Amino acid sequence: MAATVNYFEIGTPDSAAAQQFYGGLFGWQIDEPSPVGYRMLDGGAGGLWDTTALGGAAWAIFYVGVEDVQATIAKAEALGAKVLLPLIDNGAIEFAHLADPQGNRFGIWRPKTPAG
């Protein structure tokens, strides 16, 4: 996987207000929330994450596809990044959130290969 920006996400403690704002502003179709409060935006181009369980932070973030999330975390830390959300494996993807040395939040991710 080339290291390209290929997904975005909006984190919010008020997903109903975010849905109203972004749906109204850009005409995005926003799916009903999953059991963990995640909504797909505009056919999967991005996501809206209810961050209440994560302390209620708000963010806008871009994701870069990588071959190895853990190795990329280590490389980023060596270059001065901080881990904001450690590697999460949700069964379909692995991802993490980091902050660059200037404090900008970004994500890295990779799809999981189906077993078999």
Residue ranges of model-derived segments:
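N-terminal first-folded block
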Residues: 7-41
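Conserved active-site tyrosine of GNAT-family acetyltransferases
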Residues: 18-22, 76, 103
